[in-house]
Amino acid sequence: MPAPRTEPRLPAIIALLAVGGIYTALPPFLTLGPRWLLLAVVGALLIPTVVSLRTGHYQLNRVLGYVVSAVITLALVVSLVLLIKALPTRAEAAPELLRSAGALWLANILVFALWYWRLDGGGPLQRDRRGAHTEGAFLFPQMTKYSKTATEDNWSPRFIDYLFIAFNMSTAFSPSDTPVLSRWAKVLTMLQSAISLIIVALLASRAIGIL
């Protein structure tokens, strides 16, 4: 029996394509191979991912989802390593370096927002099956008894909620009003904050002539 699909997947698809699009704007020294390669790979993986969801092959859909998230994560890590290795010896203009900093910083937010969305509560499919979101890796305000109303009894997080967490982790280095409960989520949030700090510190400081 097909599982109900109440959570829209379009925001996550747009985020995945946005990560690929961001990489087309990076300078060559921050990518491996052609800059359009990541976008092409993501697009190619999204086709069977969407098809498997619509045809009810949910296990395959979940595996493909992990694969595409792993691909963009690997691309982010590779770019960060290339940045650390190459930045001290390069002489790019400050505007280009600032654009690169902004691009990688934004990619970092999207990559980890996708991981939070994909892993919390068993993923979007499991959240759909349960209906009301009463437990997970993050304690959203709507899950507490003090904020529940009659209209929030069946509340469940959407991609924008995880994007909000990821944005706060990269700007304020904290999840703001959403405590992190699970160990895996704590590890991911620490990793995201560390990557954001490295990107901002290295690229921004180089751009203004500190390095």
Residue map of PLM features:
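Pore-domain transmembrane helices of cation channels
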Residues: 87-125
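N-terminal membrane topogenic signal
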Residues: 1-15
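Short, hydrophobic transmembrane alpha-helix segments
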Residues: 23-36, 54-58
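Membrane-proximal soluble regions of multi-pass membrane proteins
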Residues: 121-178
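Structural signature of hydrophobic alpha-helical transmembrane segments
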Residues: 11, 32-45
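Cytoplasmic-side transmembrane-helix entry/capping segments in multi-pass membrane proteins
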Residues: 60-72
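Membrane-embedded alpha-helical segments in integral membrane proteins
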Residues: 16-30, 50, 82
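Pore domain of cation channels
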Residues: 156-211
